[in-house]
Amino acid sequence: MQKNQRTTAQPIGAILFDAYGTLFDVYSVALLAEELFPGRGQAVSVMWRDKQIEYTNLVSTSSHGAHYQPFWNLTRSALRYACKRLGPDLNAEAEDALMNQYRHLSAFPENRDVLQALKARGIVTGILSNGDPAMLAAAVESAGLRDLLDHVISVDAIRKYKTHPDAYSLGPQVIGLPPEQIAFVSCNSWDALAATWFGYQTLWVNRYQLPFEELGTQPLHTGSSLRDVLALPGLTRAPV
């Protein structure tokens, strides 16, 4: 794990994880997409994800949230756009199959070991996600992580998506700790950046060896897998 900023870490009492891309592999739908759309499945899955994120930003910034839609709805709309853009015929059966796959995304293999280690240290664990409550409940249950998460926080409660500051403020509100005593972990660079601006101790899980955003701010730490969470300096000062 790489430390990007020279700061003295405060004790970490809680760790919040982004869900989609961080705990759950959003590109695991590519296998099914390739079965349904031979030769175009990978491209569909990538555009689907990109358009999904674009839609969350769009509805969060337009008319003060007047156009908010639940994440499930935006995910379906993004899938339809990707298929229209790239050409494969998305019939109702294929759409339902892909959406069901998204509801039960594959979890990354290290998730359970990392969460168990954190719980053994007395760390509060949770998810802070754009996903709506029903989506998150299904994903957590499917991955077998329910017993290892103290909180599953959805931005649906405030109808504002990350990267809006109000979305990140849900963490301290629910957990009862200041953001500097909460670590926020995400594989999405835009998410890690906004969480850093908000004041969390941040870890960007750079699974795909990508460059970070060019906006003058780095996350506090960069790693390559979820296991790097266990090396966060603030954990050494946390109660065990």
Regions found by a protein language model. Give the residues of each.
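A metal-dependent, Asp-based hydrolase signature
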Residues: 42, 55-96
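Short helix-capping segments at alpha-helix termini
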Residues: 37-41, 85-90, 144-148, 176-177
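Asp-based, Mg2+/Mn2+-dependent phosphohydrolase catalytic module
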Residues: 2-15, 116, 128, 132-133, ...
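Active-site neighborhood of HAD-like aspartate-dependent phosphohydrolases
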Residues: 3-53
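Hydrophobic side chains within well-formed alpha-helices
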Residues: 29, 44, 94, 145-148
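Alpha-helical elements of Rossmann-like donor-binding domains used by nucleotide-donor carbohydrate transfer enzymes
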Residues: 31-32, 47, 77-81, 97, ...
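Hydrophobic alpha-helical core bundles mediating ligand binding, dimerization, or RNAP-core interactions
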Residues: 33, 48-52, 75, 98-102, ...
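Short, acidic loop-to-helix structural element flanking the phosphoryl-transfer center
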Residues: 72-73, 90-127, 137, 165
